[in-house]
């Protein structure tokens, strides 16, 4: 925590003025907005999945720094601080832009399609590719950790009142000495609404409400060269989230609740949560 406070203090000191929060989206699902050229974004997230007992619960702090290279190209990097690591929970991806594993991760986003469809409304699509390197030798379930590759795409519509985004992605885990975590395929759908009395311009507070749905399929892992039966599974979750923007600050939070789970004898999730604080700034 001391390291995070020092980093945040240095970044705040380097920020000369406010910027628009064009790169911020939902808590869990994928979204196509990217940062403007020269805009930096610092995220401090607290995420978790709660199971049937303390051995099943997962909680993590994750710090992510992003920068807009052009209007349509951005790069992000993130580091974890694990608070609680579940032994038997199915591996997955809690947030579209942040891994829930003890990995250092980098992601490149390219918005390849952007089109105005009316006053203050647009259609846009973005592809994300990245990779992660583990900070641990073994995963919580005893499997050897290995680097992974990540790819996803998000597309949708955004206006001053309504937001609708859909996305999907894939995470591949490498093999190491006969151990390999199961690949994860995921999708998301997000609807957002901005009530009329909140449709104000910067720098006034901006509050948006979302309903997010996330689905995951994780293949069974390989342990010592054999299929690991206590791994893999499917889940679909849905829940409410909200985003508050004020000047160069952002705060979003929400929860997802399972509507379908098939866990291959692993504990079911009760719910998952995410809280994220954001600071936008220019680096001159």
What does each model-identified segment do?
Residues 1-7:
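Bacterial N-terminal signal peptides that target proteins for export
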Residues 14-18:
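N-terminal signal peptide c-region/cleavage motif recognized by signal peptidases
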Residues 21-160, 164-166, 170-173, 183-245, ...:
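Transmembrane beta-barrel domains of Gram-negative outer membranes and organellar outer membranes
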Residues 180:
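Active-site rim beta-loop-alpha module in soluble metabolic enzymes
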């Amino acid at each position: 925590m001391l390291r995070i406070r020092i980093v945040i203090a240095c970044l705040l000191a380097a920020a000369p003025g406010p910027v628009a929060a064009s790169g911020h989206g939902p808590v869990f699902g994928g979204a196509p907005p990217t940062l403007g050229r020269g805009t930096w974004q610092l995220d401090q997230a607290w995420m978790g999945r709660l199971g049937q007992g303390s051995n099943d619960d997962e909680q993590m702090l994750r710090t992510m720094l992003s920068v807009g290279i052009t209007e349509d190209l951005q790069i992000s990097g993130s580091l974890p601080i694990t608070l609680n690591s579940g032994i038997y929970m199915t591996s997955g991806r809690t947030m579209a832009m942040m891994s829930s594993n003890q990995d250092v991760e980098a992601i490149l986003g390219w918005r390849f399609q952007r089109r105005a469809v009316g006053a203050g409304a647009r259609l846009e699509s973005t592809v994300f590719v990245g990779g992660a390197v583990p900070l641990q030798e073994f995963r919580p379930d005893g499997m050897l950790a290995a680097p992974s590759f990540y790819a996803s795409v998000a597309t949708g519509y955004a206006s001053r009142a309504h937001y609708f985004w859909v996305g999907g992605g894939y995470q591949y885990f490498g093999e190491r000495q006969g151990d390999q975590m199961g690949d994860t395929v995921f999708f998301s759908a997000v609807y957002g609404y901005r009530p009329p009395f909140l449709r104000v311009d910067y720098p006034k507070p901006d509050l948006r409400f979302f309903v997010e749905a996330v689905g995951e399929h994780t293949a069974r892992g390989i342990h010592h060269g054999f299929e690991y039966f206590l791994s893999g599974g499917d889940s679909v979750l849905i829940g409410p989230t909200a985003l508050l923007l004020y000047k160069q600050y952002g705060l979003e939070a929400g929860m997802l609740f399972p509507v379908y789970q098939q866990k291959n004898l692993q504990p079911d999730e009760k719910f998952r949560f995410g809280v994220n604080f954001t600071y936008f700034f220019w680096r001159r």
